[in-house]
Amino acid sequence: YCQAYFEYDTKKSFGITKSHLRFGRHPISSTYYVSRADFVACHNQTYLTKYDIISELKPHGSFLLNCEWKEDELEQHIPGDILRYIAENDIHFYIIDANKESQALGLGNRSNMVLQAAFFKLARVIPVEDAVAHMKDAVKKTYGLKGEKVVNMNIAAVDAGINALVEVHVKPEWKNLTGAAIQPPRADVPDIIRNILVPINAQKGDDLPVSAFKGMEDGTMPLGTSQYEKRGIATHLPVWDKDECIQCNRCSMCCPHAAIRPVLLIEEEKKSVPAGFETVPAKGLGKDSPYSFRMQVSPYDCLGCGVCLTACPAEGALTMTSFEDMKPEQTLFDEVAMNESYLKKDVINDKSVKNVQFAKPYFQFSAACAGCAETTYIKLLSQLFGDRMYIGNAAGCSSAISGGAPILPYCKDCQGHGPAWEHSLFEDNAEFLSLIHISEPTRRS
């Protein structure tokens, strides 16, 4: 017998999904989530510092971590509290680089088959030989119409999940390690971020008291909370080559999450930006343009979809590199690309793709899927009209990514101007927004 419950957040993809699985020889009547597990797997290495994962694992249980780190690198990246729990509770610790295995097989970032095979080898719900046979039969039935090549790639992924597992030697000295697994929010974040967003994102929303929502009884939430989330879930993301870039800004135009942005600076401004903010003379802005140009990526907001690389017409201007290599650039993005004082209003216009991308996006860092095409249009619309927009949102993907409280991607500028977003689930959306439009002159008179 088997039972499955699933726990997940509001994000369309790359959010957290917890699969609570029970297996037994007798009917299972439990009506609650698993809180003490024999086996726990973490499929994204960044979750270790975002969620309380390891404490739900029983002593002598098995822990599987999908990560790009080698065994001798684990102590550099895994918080001391987690390693101490593993050592103190005699946990059987395994690692696998499922992303590397799936990419080598031509499956891109689809590592589910690799990780499923690894689960059956470690959990031993049924003999691993039987599990492998069943999985390969399922592959043939599921992907048979897609051709022999796709079938063979997925069969190879099953074998990779069995063979690529590495058992980690748990060191006794880990029992003496310290270091909090979940990092506290920065000291300068607003109270709503500290008291509401952070607990909800850590799957602790049920612990919040009613008093935490004082002042928001009518359901309104402040704009722009998504900028504080900094999910950091992309394992690989683009790095900009200043010598190859032709400064067309297509990458920024096509980015679904506003995570890559062009910046223009004058000579005086270049003296005050952080070290490492390298620029080149701006192109296409006139012969005597005083500006220098840089395309800046936000490592913690990028989802690694690769749309920017596909859109880029200049070979080599953008290449993919590891998240670890790009982490230091977050400061450059936050202090310069997000700083409205560096916006050049004399350059911004709606006459070309290039120039409109120098405008502030009033829709950023949403919970949309990696590579989403819909948010690209919303972001562009916000760059054109964002400081004076009323938005009535019909139910669907766009409402989930736009109003999934407390993460709101619509934001306001330094003058307090920005889109006003509303969503009414049970009303005709055209009628709903038209009445808002009709009522506005009356409210202002």
Please describe what each predicted stretch is.
Residues V114, P127-K141, D218-L237, P262-M295, ...:
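Ferredoxin-type iron-sulfur electron-transfer modules in oxidoreductases and energy-metabolism complexes
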Residues G224-S226, R250-E269, S298, L303-D325, ...:
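Iron-sulfur cluster-binding cysteine motifs and their immediate structural context
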Residues Y1-I200, K270, P274-A275:
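Active-site cofactor/cluster-binding pocket
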